[in-house]
């Protein structure tokens, strides 16, 4: 299995606690409202929202993909850390085994925070994820971050 890793970070005037809640804990209900073209809906297949929960996400018309199945790997409300894996769906392109996503909101001295996102692509065999796909994933994470941040500032 091949492994490729990508990291991106962004700063916000929103507190780490509030941004963590919006980006991670409330994302299933918030994202279809703030970016309706990105995600249509999310349905829980197993679990209660905590670690081990499996969700089927129906992506929106703005996405080149239709669905993805996610599994919640870790939630740490004390350190504002959230991890999930994409374990199925056309987003895996047939040559990716899974995609691990890790988000952390780190409090800043000014009351805002820095959001750090790490994406790990686990490929089948020695397949390589093209750079444009990695860039697309990073851009999607930043787009989601900016949309949720704007919503939280306005509300």
Swiss-Prot record:
<dbReference type="InterPro" id="IPR000916">
    <property type="entry name" value="Bet_v_I/MLP"/>
</dbReference>
<dbReference type="GO" id="GO:0038023">
    <property type="term" value="F:signaling receptor activity"/>
</dbReference>
<dbReference type="InterPro" id="IPR023393">
    <property type="entry name" value="START-like_dom_sf"/>
</dbReference>
<protein>
    <recommendedName>
        <fullName>Pathogenesis-related protein B</fullName>
    </recommendedName>
</protein>
<dbReference type="GO" id="GO:0004864">
    <property type="term" value="F:protein phosphatase inhibitor activity"/>
</dbReference>
<dbReference type="InterPro" id="IPR050279">
    <property type="entry name" value="Plant_def-hormone_signal"/>
</dbReference>
<dbReference type="GO" id="GO:0010427">
    <property type="term" value="F:abscisic acid binding"/>
</dbReference>
<dbReference type="Pfam" id="PF00407">
    <property type="entry name" value="Bet_v_1"/>
</dbReference>
<comment type="similarity">
    <text>Belongs to the BetVI family.</text>
</comment>
<dbReference type="GO" id="GO:0005737">
    <property type="term" value="C:cytoplasm"/>
</dbReference>
<dbReference type="GO" id="GO:0009738">
    <property type="term" value="P:abscisic acid-activated signaling pathway"/>
</dbReference>
<dbReference type="GO" id="GO:0006952">
    <property type="term" value="P:defense response"/>
</dbReference>
<dbReference type="GO" id="GO:0005634">
    <property type="term" value="C:nucleus"/>
</dbReference>
<keyword id="KW-0568">Pathogenesis-related protein</keyword>
<keyword id="KW-0611">Plant defense</keyword>
<dbReference type="InterPro" id="IPR024949">
    <property type="entry name" value="Bet_v_I_allergen"/>
</dbReference>
């Amino acid at each position: 299995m091949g492994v490729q890793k990508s990291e991106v970070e962004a700063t916000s005037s929103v507190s780490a606690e509030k941004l963590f809640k919006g980006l991670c804990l409330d994302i299933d209900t918030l994202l279809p409202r703030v970016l309706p073209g990105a995600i249509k809906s999310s349905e829980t297949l197993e679990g209660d929202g905590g670690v081990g929960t499996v969700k089927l996400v129906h992506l929106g018309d703005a996405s080149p993909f239709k669905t993805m199945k996610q599994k919640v790997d870790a939630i740490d409300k004390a350190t504002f850390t959230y991890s999930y894996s994409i374990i199925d769906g056309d987003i895996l392109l047939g040559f990716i085994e899974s995609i691990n996503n890790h988000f952390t909101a780190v409090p800043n001295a000014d009351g805002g925070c820095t959001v750090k996102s790490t994406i790990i692509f686990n490929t089948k065999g020695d397949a390589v994820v093209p750079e444009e796909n990695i860039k697309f994933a990073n851009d999607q994470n930043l787009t989601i971050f900016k949309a949720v941040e704007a919503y939280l500032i306005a509300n």
